[in-house]
Amino acid sequence: MKTRPLGIGLLSGGLDSALSCVVTREAGADIRCLHFFTGFCVTGHNSRVGRTDRPIANHALQVAAEIGASLELVDVSEEYLPMVLKPKHGYGRNMNPCIDCRVFMLRRARDYMERTGADFVFTGEVVGQRPKSQVKTALRAIEKEAGLEGRLLRPLSARILPPTVAERTGLIDREKLHGFSGRGRKPQIDLAHRYGITAYSQPAGGCCFLTDSSYSTKFKDVIAHGGSGSLSVDDVFVLGVGRHFRFSPVLKAIVGRNAEENDFLARMAGDHWSAGVVGFNGPTAVVVGEIRDDDWVEIASIVARYSDGKNKESIEVEFVRGGTAKRVRTAPASADFVAIHRI
């Protein structure tokens, strides 16, 4: 009995990566999938914070279960962060280093392929779907830089790309692959209906914080104020929590937006000052940096602004660190003051 070739797939949990698995299998290969945890995924963030108002799921696990594919989760967050801070190919519209990200993941998939004796790597990329990383010239450059020339199958667009080694040697039936291109999703959605795939996440990069303008602004703020040299994965994670306010180059505050974020901030405060309103329901805030003089009142006024006492003439805010507590009475901040300091 002839042994089927083995393909290593990158499974994000999105529509295209899900389809790439099924199409590759139908074209004659066994598949094994990898899902990389980078620290910048929205669904992973919601799970860690404890969000209950949004669906919390790892779509890659759901898709793998639905299509019957083996899946290995790989934490690459510590290696991934330095690449994000200094991408060789630069950023997209926000802080998203899409080309460098692709090369990063494909190199690790190549290493896995070589360790396991697999025949090729495959992805759900579609020609022309993304303006920077999925035009034909970029696809070729990424494949070369990742060390996968001739061994990277893109089954959804294979018919409009040069045949890979697996196709040329008959390991994969090229006639069972597709020639999708462009930003339209209808062909993929129709194909998903045909295969009965329903567990995939929504398209358009919605899982990556780095494509989000608000998150990217906070990321740039940390880098601008000297944080890149000592930035950790946990620091990056906190950028997705709460409202962030800058008071000086060395002082900022994070104010929770809901009960889950308040609980999370209270847990992560550690050696930082935390703050909350006295006598009213309100947010938990964590202060990063040392508070000086007028900073107490300014921070307290913003915390008060987001409390149930925001319409009072003045309210008390309590700051706590370890066994030390300090109370400050202040008027809630004006909208203009909030706008000046919000990152």
List PLM regions with ranges.
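ATP-dependent adenylation/nucleotidyltransferase module used to activate substrates
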Residues: 1-194, 324, 331-333, 341-343
